[in-house]
Amino acid sequence: MLLLPSCFAQGPKLTVSEPQKVTLKRGSSATVKITAALNEGFHANSHTPSDENLIPLTLNWTPGVAVAKDVVYPKPKMEKYSFSDKPLSVVTGSFDLTTTFAVPASAPAGDGFLTGKLRYQACNDKACFPPKNVEVKVPVTVQ
């Protein structure tokens, strides 16, 4: 039987807090905030990684009752790790991503969801892990 050190027992995990229901008004714009968190001991590359071989943090929304116009990512930190010669642009702990949506005047009234995928590459202080996607689902009411 092979026993791995505890640092490998639990890999990175990014969780997204359940978003509050958002009211969208037809013909206007709305802002939606998503809060995500990485487990302790891990970081994710920022949306602007400092090395071209690293995979950026991205939030992509599926077109639906509203269209994503702008995503504001968390302000990254520059941190040095043993596996890199230079500091890396990363996010750690809990962080927010804010998206501005345009709601068409023709959007159907009623309840629904805005759906998207948050893609990230997590690392610890020794190595980076394969990228993962987390589904994001925001309940909305269109008026």
Task: Annotate each language-model stretch with its function.
Residues C7-Q143:
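Extracellular/lumen-exposed scaffold segments
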Residues M1-S6:
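Bacterial N-terminal signal peptides
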